Swiss-Prot record:
The lineage of its organism: Eukaryota, Metazoa, Ecdysozoa, Arthropoda, Chelicerata. Expressed by the venom gland. Negative results: does not modify the currents of the human voltage-gated sodium channels Nav1.1/SCN1A, Nav1.2/SCN2A, Nav1.3/SCN3A and Nav1.7/SCN9A. This is Beta-toxin Cbo4. SUPFAM superfamilies: Scorpion toxin-like (SSF57095). Has the structural arrangement of an alpha-helix connected to antiparallel beta-sheets by disulfide bonds (CS-alpha/beta).
Length: 66
């Protein structure tokens, strides 16, 4: 599974400025999911790959980014 990392409180994606390989996104994906996850900056938000099927990613059901 893959998808944008999401803040559970706001419903917003984690933003990033440096597109492509991005240490911040890799770190956040691994902290949020697990060590084998990978991340990069895509469309100015952190995109995570190699996630488990039950991983919660953006968009959250019934929660819109404010």
């Amino acid at each position: 599974k893959e998808g944008y990392i999401v803040d559970y409180h706001t419903g917003c994606k984690y933003t990033c400025a440096k597109l492509g390989d991005n240490d911040y996104c890799v770190r956040e994906c691994r902290l949020r999911y697990y060590q084998s996850a990978h991340g990069y900056c895509y469309a100015f938000a952190c995109w995570c790959t190699h996630l488990y099927e039950q991983a919660v990613v953006w968009p959250l059901p019934n929660k819109r980014c404010k």
